[in-house]
Amino acid sequence: MLVNVNVVEAAANADVDRYFLASSVCVYRDMELGEAELTEDDAYPALPDNEYGWEKLYAERAVASYAREGRFQARIARFQNCYGPQGTWTGGREKAPAALCRKVAESTDGTIEVWGDGSAVRSFIYVDDLVEGVRRLVDSDVSDPTNIGTREYVSVRELVDLVSSSAEKEITPLWVPGPVGVQNRNFSNDRIESLGFEPTFDLVQ
């Protein structure tokens, strides 16, 4: 948290015109399957499901406080899960698409271990689309936090099937105990779409 505060203060002291913060949809509470999309205003009352979400929410508040004082213009993007070339694919910090691609590629017996039961739902955005969303937000007059993601939602089980099909391999997932995070991620992209943003990549590509 101190890193964010120090960078924001340094930017304000340097008289920057516009400050961009990469936040996260982890600022939101956990969701149940079938629940309506959360809008940006639904981040409050605050109840992030982990410390990372709280850290991002505090960073948003720090940026907003300087913006209210007229120190700079703020642009805050809440990223959904991002994937693409050069992304982390080993070590336990990789996103689900990269982890499953690696596991399927390395499988020699037609099985892979996957945490949970496969019912958790996520949305993933390709890095090029994410960058385009950021560009549109930064160039706009929107100063409120803005979700950037896609409307393509997939369960972990469906993602396993998609990766297996793309690899042309018959894979049987072995569901094992492990951290799965929140059950569902379902967020409104109306605000970023009002700026003309539309993802061009889907998971199959």
Which residues does each PLM region occupy?
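Conserved Rossmann-fold NAD(P)-dependent oxidoreductase catalytic core, especially the SDR/UDP-sugar
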Residues: 5-51, 75
